[in-house]
Amino acid sequence: MVADILDNRLELAKEYGATAVVNTKNQSLEDFTNEFTNGKGFDVCIEACGAPETFLGCIENAAFAGNIVLIGNGKRETSFVHSIILKKELNIFGSRNALKEDFINNIDLVASKECDVMKMVSRVYDMENALDAFKALANNDGTLAKILIKIGD
């Protein structure tokens, strides 16, 4: 299950195999979670954008004794009553980097073409236009998923 506020990202998630998606601009995540999990919540919630609202959404929608993994690098302060973590006996993990093995496995996956990673590439720039690529990303209106900078032929 994938939640987002951008339809294009939800469509991309479906292309990669997500069996359920919810646009939280149009539907309450809590309502969707209750319907999807029969009121139990999710065993694992992965917060990938770093926004306080999405972290709080993970806490609210995690199952009893659920796991929350934070990979989004947030810059804003998050305030909440921590007793919900205790009452639900949640496990919260932070992850900033990957292991060398993870990079090797991902390189092998891309090389095998088992997963078409190019579906998520919105634009390709040559190295000499790398500054334009970073500007496009800095001014992203939500339509860009990933940008690829091509080095060499």
Give the predicted meaning of each segment:
Residues 1-57:
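Adenosine-nucleotide cofactor-binding segment
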Residues 4-5, 24-28, 49-50, 73, ...:
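Short beta->alpha linker loops
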Residues 7, 56-60, 100-153:
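C-terminal hydrophobic helical "lid"/dimerization subdomain
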Residues 51-112, 150-153:
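Glycine-rich phosphate-binding loop and adjacent beta-alpha segment
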